[in-house]
């Protein structure tokens, strides 16, 4: 058996091929797993669990079917869907996890997260993240009418795209010291995350021992998952 990890699908109505690929994944590979972990940015945007977007209800039903089949499903918030709440989690049968979670998997101690908190060189993003994660601001935003939230979200995405276009690729990647610090804080030799859209397996030293950072790919033109078994940790790309 295996435990599966995915991230950065950025589901939206404008990308039906990705949605179809995810549905096939849920009906196939996911049903064979010991557990499924979604490490953030499942959706391109999330403005509240009360958004009547049909895509959200379709995905909730599909994930719930996996959960009901006996495969526990877990979710860590990303930078795009950090407002996904308990209502949607309940509808989809997912368990919400904190932004950093340590798992004991087949004899390995593994830290999982979305990954945006590791990009500490991007001071502008980290300041923005700290602001939008303030509980009072989230409560205020979610109390706004839905049409207002949609306008704000669209403007924020446009601003983010413009800001990122002028940033170097290095700034938007993880900071190596932040990676080592997180792994040593949790006393792990394995880290799995997404966010950067740069799939790879990196070797490093943490806790004075060899360690590994596994980065999930985004679902743009193909699927990406990490498959952890008793024998191996594999980064796998597959066609939709």
From Swiss-Prot:
Q: Name one GO cellular component term.
A: extrinsic component of plasma membrane
Pathway(s) the chain acts in: Glycolipid biosynthesis; lipid IV(A) biosynthesis; lipid IV(A) from (3R)-3-hydroxytetradecanoyl-[acyl-carrier-protein] and UDP-N-acetyl-alpha-D-glucosamine: step 4/6
Q: Write the signal peptide boundaries.
A: none
Record's subcellular location: Cell inner membrane
Binding site residues for Mn(2+) 2: 41, 79, 114, 195
What keywords are annotated for this sequence in UniProt? Cell inner membrane, Cell membrane, Hydrolase, Lipid A biosynthesis, Lipid biosynthesis, Lipid metabolism, Manganese, Membrane, Metal-binding
Concerning InterPro entries, the annotation shows: Calcineurin-like_PHP_ApaH, LpxH-like, Metallo-depent_PP-like, UDP-diacylglucosamine_Hdrlase
- Spell out the molecular function terms from Gene Ontology: manganese ion binding; UDP-2,3-diacylglucosamine hydrolase activity
Instruction: Quote the record's cofactor note.
Output: Binds 2 Mn(2+) ions per subunit in a binuclear metal center.
Q: Does the keyword Magnesium apply?
A: no
Q: Where does Mn(2+) 1 bind?
A: 8, 10, 41, 197
Q: Which reaction does it catalyse?
A: UDP-2-N,3-O-bis[(3R)-3-hydroxytetradecanoyl]-alpha-D-glucosamine + H2O = 2-N,3-O-bis[(3R)-3-hydroxytetradecanoyl]-alpha-D-glucosaminyl 1-phosphate + UMP + 2 H(+)
Residues the record lists as binding substrate:
79-80, 122, 160, 164, 167, 195
EC number from the UniProt entry = 3.6.1.54
Alphabetical list of CDD domains matching this protein: MPP_YbbF-LpxH (cd07398)
The cofactor(s) it depends on are: Mn(2+)
- What is a biological process (GO) this protein takes part in? lipid A biosynthetic process
Membrane topology reported for the UniProt record: Peripheral membrane protein
Q: What family is this protein classified in? A: Belongs to the LpxH family.
**What the protein does?**
Hydrolyzes the pyrophosphate bond of UDP-2,3-diacylglucosamine to yield 2,3-diacylglucosamine 1-phosphate (lipid X) and UMP by catalyzing the attack of water at the alpha-P atom. Involved in the biosynthesis of lipid A, a phosphorylated glycolipid that anchors the lipopolysaccharide to the outer membrane of the cell.
Q: What is this protein called?
A: UDP-2,3-diacylglucosamine hydrolase
Organism of this sequence: Escherichia coli O1:K1 / APEC
Q: Which gene encodes it?
A: lpxH
């Amino acid at each position: 058996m295996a435990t599966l990890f995915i991230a950065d699908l950025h589901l939206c109505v404008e990308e039906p091929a990705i949605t179809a690929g995810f549905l096939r994944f849920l009906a196939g590979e996911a049903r064979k797993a010991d557990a499924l972990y979604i490490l953030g940015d499942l959706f391109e945007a999330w403005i509240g669990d009360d958004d009547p977007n049909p895509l959200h209800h379709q995905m909730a039903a599909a994930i719930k079917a996996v959960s009901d089949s006996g495969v526990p499903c877990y979710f860590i918030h990303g930078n795009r869907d950090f407002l996904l709440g308990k209502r949607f989690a309940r509808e989809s049968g997912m368990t919400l996890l904190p932004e950093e979670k340590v798992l004991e998997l087949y004899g390995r101690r593994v830290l999982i997260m979305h990954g945006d908190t590791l990009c500490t060189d991007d001071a502008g993003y980290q300041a923005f993240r700290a602001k939008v994660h303030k509980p009072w601001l989230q409560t205020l935003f979610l109390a706004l009418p839905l049409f207002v939230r949609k306008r704000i979200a669209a403007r924020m995405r446009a601003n983010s795209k413009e800001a990122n276009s002028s940033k170097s690729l290095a700034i938007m990647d993880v900071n190596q010291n932040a990676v080592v610090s997180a792994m040593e804080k949790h006393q792990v030799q394995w880290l799995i995350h997404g966010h950067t859209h740069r799939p790879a397996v990196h070797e490093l030293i943490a806790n004075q021992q060899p360690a590994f950072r596994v980065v999930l790919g985004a679902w743009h033109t193909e699927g990406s998952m990490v498959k952890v078994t008793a024998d191996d940790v594999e980064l796998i790309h597959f066609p939709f």
